[in-house]
């Protein structure tokens, strides 16, 4: 993490803010991580139960509009669990 390398608190704070965003401090007031944070929703899993700590592949947009959109419906397009998403999140936490 560049904030750690450069010893810059402002850059470290950006990383902390991004972690908070994932866990519910976002325009949706909803955690994107299943089972953790505030107001989390089920994620799409085809062959397993919901996995606590899993993160979805991304955030959906509302058509061609650049507005916050995180519907409660469960869909493989934006709420599917991919291992790399959760892995990268854990990597960031290790650096903080």
What are the residue ranges of the model-derived segments?
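Aromatic (Trp/Tyr) and acidic
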Residues: 1-96
């Amino acid at each position: 993490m560049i904030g750690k390398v450069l010893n810059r608190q402002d850059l470290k704070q950006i990383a902390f803010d991004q972690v908070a965003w994932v866990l519910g401090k976002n325009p949706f007031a909803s955690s994107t991580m299943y089972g953790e944070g505030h107001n989390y929703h089920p994620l799409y899993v085809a062959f397993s139960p919901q996995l606590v700590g899993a993160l979805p592949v991304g955030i959906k947009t509302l058509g061609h509009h650049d507005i916050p959109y995180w519907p409660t419906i469960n869909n493989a397009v934006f709420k599917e669990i991919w291992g790399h998403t959760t892995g990268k999140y854990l990597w960031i936490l290790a650096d903080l």
